[in-house]
Amino acid sequence: MVADANGSSSSSFNFLIYGKTGWIGGLLGKLCEAQGITYTYGSGRLQDRQSIVADIESVKPSHVFNAAGVTGRPNVDWCESHKVETIRTNVAGTLTLADICREKGLVLINYATGCIFEYDSGHPLGSGIGFKEEDTPNFTGSFYSKTKAMVEELLKNYENVCTLRVRMPISSDLTNPRNFITKIARYEKVVDIPNSMTILDELLPISIEMAKRNLTGIYNFTNPGVVSHNEILEMYRDYIDPSFTWKNFTLEEQAKVIVAPRSNNELDATKLKTEFPELMSIKESLIKFVFEPNKKTEVKA
């Protein structure tokens, strides 16, 4: 029997998880297994109310996790030409799930996005002034981000929902094509802009603890601080592949090869850090959870 931080055993929890085929959903199942938490993957489609109700009545969960959603393949540009499909899952589906959970008195942990902000005059690049949970989203450059900002605003009315703003997720699995490090290491050229990011190896276990504590409301679900593309690729070179090289290009040059603009921002992680004081800064977390476990070369001090 596994005990959580509050002393109650993990056997008293029973999680219903949506997003079985997704990256975060898959990792959540593995974490539940490791912690001895009973879990079931939902089989219903998010936008199909009856199938969600059937899942909940069958599983009788203590908490529900939503890691389902449309991000687009290979990237968010897909959403620009598949707007109805994007709305169906990211807006209608998420709201349906939140509404049913509220009816059933269940906390919903909703993995959302922080890609709904961009640096502005009040939060300039390099200033260390991050966007807070209560700030109004200011980035609608992509249809994906637009739908995510809409649904976040509506979910504020559901007191049972915990919205986690994930950004540029990274994990220790460098073979996963969704991993931000793997993505940028494969790009022909990359921009170099400091951003808030989410180290899943550290933060996903925290999200399980948030469910156990029945936390609700919006959280910037990122490690404190920012890291740039070049800083990550320098670590990749130093720890993984000393022969690795890359080329940079400007935002203007990037705009010519993508359909929708991308969000760049710093999120203020104070609220999460206050709840979880052990939370590591982005660069510390990258080294501990990603680069040290994957180290192939002796790193020069």
Swiss-Prot record:
<protein>
    <recommendedName>
        <fullName>Bifunctional dTDP-4-dehydrorhamnose 3,5-epimerase/dTDP-4-dehydrorhamnose reductase</fullName>
        <ecNumber>1.1.1.133</ecNumber>
        <ecNumber>5.1.3.13</ecNumber>
    </recommendedName>
</protein>
<dbReference type="GO" id="GO:0005886">
    <property type="term" value="C:plasma membrane"/>
</dbReference>
<comment type="pathway">
    <text>Carbohydrate biosynthesis; dTDP-L-rhamnose biosynthesis.</text>
</comment>
<keyword id="KW-0961">Cell wall biogenesis/degradation</keyword>
<dbReference type="GO" id="GO:0010490">
    <property type="term" value="F:UDP-4-keto-rhamnose-4-keto-reductase activity"/>
</dbReference>
<dbReference type="InterPro" id="IPR005913">
    <property type="entry name" value="dTDP_dehydrorham_reduct"/>
</dbReference>
<keyword id="KW-0413">Isomerase</keyword>
<dbReference type="InterPro" id="IPR029903">
    <property type="entry name" value="RmlD-like-bd"/>
</dbReference>
<dbReference type="GO" id="GO:0008830">
    <property type="term" value="F:dTDP-4-dehydrorhamnose 3,5-epimerase activity"/>
</dbReference>
<dbReference type="InterPro" id="IPR036291">
    <property type="entry name" value="NAD(P)-bd_dom_sf"/>
</dbReference>
<dbReference type="GO" id="GO:0019305">
    <property type="term" value="P:dTDP-rhamnose biosynthetic process"/>
</dbReference>
<dbReference type="GO" id="GO:0010253">
    <property type="term" value="P:UDP-rhamnose biosynthetic process"/>
</dbReference>
<dbReference type="GO" id="GO:0009506">
    <property type="term" value="C:plasmodesma"/>
</dbReference>
<feature type="binding site">
    <location>
        <begin position="23"/>
        <end position="24"/>
    </location>
    <ligand>
        <name>NADPH</name>
    </ligand>
</feature>
<keyword id="KW-0560">Oxidoreductase</keyword>
<dbReference type="GO" id="GO:0008831">
    <property type="term" value="F:dTDP-4-dehydrorhamnose reductase activity"/>
</dbReference>
<comment type="function">
    <text>Bifunctional enzyme involved in dTDP-beta-L-rhamnose biosynthesis. Catalyzes the epimerization of the C3' and C5'positions of dTDP-6-deoxy-4-keto-alpha-D-glucose to form dTDP-4-keto-beta-L-rhamnose and its reduction to yield dTDP-beta-L-rhamnose. Can form UDP-beta-L-rhamnose from UDP-6-deoxy-4-keto-alpha-D-glucose, but cannot convert GDP-4-dehydro-6-deoxy-D-mannose to GDP-fucose.</text>
</comment>
<dbReference type="GO" id="GO:0071555">
    <property type="term" value="P:cell wall organization"/>
</dbReference>
<keyword id="KW-0521">NADP</keyword>
<feature type="binding site">
    <location>
        <position position="111"/>
    </location>
    <ligand>
        <name>NADPH</name>
    </ligand>
</feature>
<dbReference type="Pfam" id="PF04321">
    <property type="entry name" value="RmlD_sub_bind"/>
</dbReference>
<dbReference type="GO" id="GO:0010489">
    <property type="term" value="F:UDP-4-keto-6-deoxy-glucose-3,5-epimerase activity"/>
</dbReference>
<feature type="binding site">
    <location>
        <begin position="69"/>
        <end position="71"/>
    </location>
    <ligand>
        <name>NADPH</name>
    </ligand>
</feature>
<comment type="similarity">
    <text>Belongs to the dTDP-4-dehydrorhamnose reductase family.</text>
</comment>
